[in-house]
A protein has these predicted regions:
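C-terminal substrate-binding/catalytic lobe of Rossmann-fold NAD(P)-dependent dehydrogenases
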Residues: 598-605, 618, 630
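Alpha-helical transmembrane segments of multi-pass integral membrane proteins
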Residues: 516, 582-598, 631, 667
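A C-terminal functional module that forms or caps the active site or interfaces directly
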Residues: 640
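Membrane-water interface at loop-to-transmembrane-helix junctions
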Residues: 570-590, 615-624
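Membrane-interface interhelical connector segments
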Residues: 606-615
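Conserved cytosolic headpiece of P-type ATPases
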Residues: 1-568, 573-576, 589, 626, ...
Length: 726
């Protein structure tokens, strides 16, 4: 909206002139963009913040418990070595060593899935950020729309026609009222209107494997396609041309006429300019007086519908005329108007609705005119009630923008700093923002956003460098698909954490419980030949298998239904919330009880006085407790496949990796119990178990599955009762 200004980096393609340099370096528009880039710090993703907070909490808790455990053991009479080993065992049991690697693999799989849907993620954590996005700030042209101008309405001979079909494919119908018509059977003026757009034109339609594209100006391409839809495909020889120049607002061409004694001048341009050159118009095949007011009203109506409007006119001249000059363009006959627009992508309409169901607000930020932006917003159901222009934004302070930014969904005629300001104020409102952009001037906003999205086809290298994600097809619908994948990634991360932490907690509770009972039960007291229920090396093995064979398959869980029906999660929501602690407590307690019961049941006979090999009995009891803890892990795995849904609602074969992981874990456990001691390699200090011991071990392992299933049912019912009445 600035006049008489040439920006740094502008190329002059025509004419001559003089200018006064009013800014250099950082004071130019390009310089301002560079300054914005320098001033913009890339923010930490929500997941990274949560993991960092959670890690601090976990480390503090584990160290505190380990120190308390050590002091308690010393006070209870344990020697320093036993106290230290017990504390180390507890710390090893509590810390999920494999969790960082699993989180990385989960994010990597999410990135791979997004790449298959035309979204390239540059930073792994950004894959999850998409899942908690609350606002998507998107460009219009090429992202929401096809970036293919299409003629949608024609006015000719006092009649209005609708033209179907979008894009550059020459397929569509002409509709008048409620009837489909053949343009060739209407008055001459409709065909002549289409022919003028076709002849007064330098664009061409190119077909490649049934895919159509335009070679030339998109506006001229739209006129070629509308003519081709009416069956016009042949050109008469062009003799001369007055090219389009913005200042004159028209283009004229001279062609050989159909008759031997005439040539034809075709003119297209802005309705106002073309009407000034006309003296009459063609209606029903007859020359009649020019109805300027009616034509102006129709042009205004089209413009109000976000159509770019061009007027068409022609004039017959003598056969001897072979050149065309501006003065030849007086006394034209007006033919009609063609109104065209860059239509929305078909899939975007559905994608915007998905965003609404998912609780994500779509905000259009465009450099186009307010009326055009408003019309596209109306078509896409984005919300066109309030349109804020760049000029209005410039007059607002940041605090004023902050007050209204959540109520405006369309920003038009914006400059780079406006996009940047809108992004910052939306973030200030507590939103997680995804911003799209393709130009150098979009880079500051892309960098400032929680996730910057650059266009892969039309985007500049600067915008791609500043972005976290690149759309390979420049399509808004791909963003929505990536959001769904982002939510899927976070769901699987939650599943992994809610599986790993409770199982680690169960081992810790088993060690701590045994330590507290040691003064009262010889089986747990090293001073009387007793041992802890599981050894540190066994805990390390459980944690290793837990991470590789059991927790890792959870990241391959298929998407649950209705991911995009849920509202975005609260960016401030912590991983360790009340639900988390409840589940950790339940699983830890059940697992510790199962291990304790088996160890006590099979270990206490070692102190009966009639046992020949006391050490073997305790080793077998430890092996049984060790194996029971592993069995509880396997049983919990099958219910941990969903945090909220019952395991009975989906097929056990929908994730084959869970079955493979469980089978591999069981196979390795059998090898540790029976094979290694037999061949004399026994780093895990296990002993072969009698076959009949397996029945009690399995029986105490199964309850975890049903207890968690019951917990899910109660939680779901409780949430339904807490749902607000509307």
């Amino acid at each position: 909206d600035q006049h008489g200004i040439a920006f740094s980096g502008t190329f002059i393609t025509q004419g001559t002139g003089q200018g006064v340099v009013i800014a250099t370096g950082e004071h130019t528009e390009i310089g301002k963009i560079a300054e914005l880039m320098k001033a913009t710090q890339k923010i930490t993703t929500p997941l990274m913040k949560k993991i960092a907070d959670f890690t601090r909490l976990l480390v503090i808790a584990v160290l505190t418990i380990a120190v308390i455990n050590f002091l308690l053991a010393v006070l209870l009479g344990f020697d320093l070595e036993s106290s230290f080993l017990a504390s180390v065992s507890l710390a090893v049991a509590a810390i999920p060593e494999g969790l960082p690697a699993i989180l990385t693999v989960t994010l990597a799989l999410g990135v791979t899935a997004m790449a298959r849907k035309n979204a390239l993620i540059k930073r792994l954590p950004a894959a999850e950020t998409l899942g908690c996005t609350t606002v998507i700030c998107t460009d219009k042209t090429g992202t929401l729309t096809k970036n293919q101008m299409t003629v949608a309405r024609i006015y000719s001979g006092g009649k209005e026609y609708q033209v179907s079909g979008v894009g550059y494919a020459p397929a569509g119908e002409f509709v008048s009222g409620n009837n489909t018509i053949n343009p060739g059977e209407e008055g001459d003026e409709l065909i002549e209107t289409l022919k003028t757009g076709y002849m007064c034109n330098n664009a061409s339609l190119v077909e490649n494997n049934r895919e159509y594209s335009i070679l030339g100006d998109p506006t001229e391409g739209a006129l070629v396609v509308s003519a081709r839809k009416a069956g016009i495909s042949s050109h008469s020889t062009k003799l001369d041309e007055i090219p389009f120049v913005a200042e004159q607002q028209y283009m004229g061409t001279l062609h050989e006429g159909a008759g031997e004694n005439e040539h034809v001048i075709y003119v297209k341009g802005s309705p106002e300019r073309v009407l000034k050159m006309c003296q009459d118009q063609l209606v029903n095949g007859n020359i009649v007086s020019l109805r300027s007011e009616e034509i102006h009203a129709e042009a205004d109506s089209m413009a109000g519908g976000a159509l770019r409007v061009l007027g068409m006119a022609y004039k017959l001249v003598p056969h001897a005329q072979n050149t065309l000059k501006p003065e030849d363009l007086d006394g034209l006959t007006f033919l009609g108007l063609q109104g065209m627009m860059d239509p929305p992508r078909e899939e975007v309409i559905g994608a915007v609705q998905k965003c609404k169901h998912a609780g994500i607000r779509v905000v259009m930020i465009t450099g186009d005119h307010a009326q055009t932006a408003k019309a596209i917003a109306r078509l896409l159901d984005i919300g066109e009630d309030t349109v804020l222009t760049g000029e209005e934004l410039s007059r607002m302070s940041d605090d004023e923008l902050y007050e209204i930014v959540d109520t405006v969904s369309v920003f038009a005629r914006v400059a780079p700093e406006h996009k940047f300001r809108v992004t910052k104020q939306l973030q200030r409102r507590g939103n997680i923002i995804a911003v799209t952009g393709d130009g150098v001037n979009d880079a500051p906003a892309l960098k400032a956003a929680d996730i910057g999205i650059a266009m892969g086809i039309t985007g500049t290298e600067v915008s791609k460098e500043a972005a976290d994600m690149i759309l390979t097809d420049d399509n808004f619908a791909s963003i929505v698909s990536a959001v769904e994948e982002g939510r899927h990634v976070f769901e699987n991360i939650r599943k992994v954490i809610l599986y790993t932490l409770p199982t680690n907690g169960g081992q810790s509770l088993l060690i701590l419980g045994a330590l507290l009972l040691a003064p009262f039960i010889y089986l747990f007291n090293p001073q009387y030949g007793g041992r802890l229920p599981i050894e540190p090396v066994q805990i390390l093995w459980i944690n290793l298998i837990d991470a590789v064979a059991l927790a890792l398959p959870l990241i391959k869980e298929p998407k649950e239904k209705g991911l995009l029906e849920r509202p975005p999660r609260d960016p401030g929501e912590k991983i360790a919330d009340s639900t988390f602690f409840k589940k950790v407590g339940i699983v830890s307690l059940v697992m510790a009880l199962a291990g304790f019961i088996i160890y006590y049941y099979y270990g206490m006979p070692a102190f009966s006085g009639s046992v020949v090999d006391k050490d073997l009995i305790i080793t077998q009891a430890q092996t049984a407790a060790f194996t029971t803890v592993m069995l509880v892990h396997i049983c919990y795995l099958f219910t941990a496949r969903s945090i909220t849904e019952s395991a009975f609602r989906f097929s056990p074969f929908s994730n084959k990796w869970v079955l493979i992981g469980a089978a591999a874990t069981l196979g390795l456990q059998l090898a540790i119990i029976y094979a290694l001691p037999t061949i004399g390699i026994n780093p895990f200090r296990t002993a072969p178990l009698p076959a009949e011991w397996w029945i009690p071990m399995i029986l105490v392992s199964l309850p975890i599955f049903f207890i968690i299933e019951f917990e899910k049912l109660l939680t779901k019912r409780w949430r339904k009762t807490k749902r607000p009445i509307t």
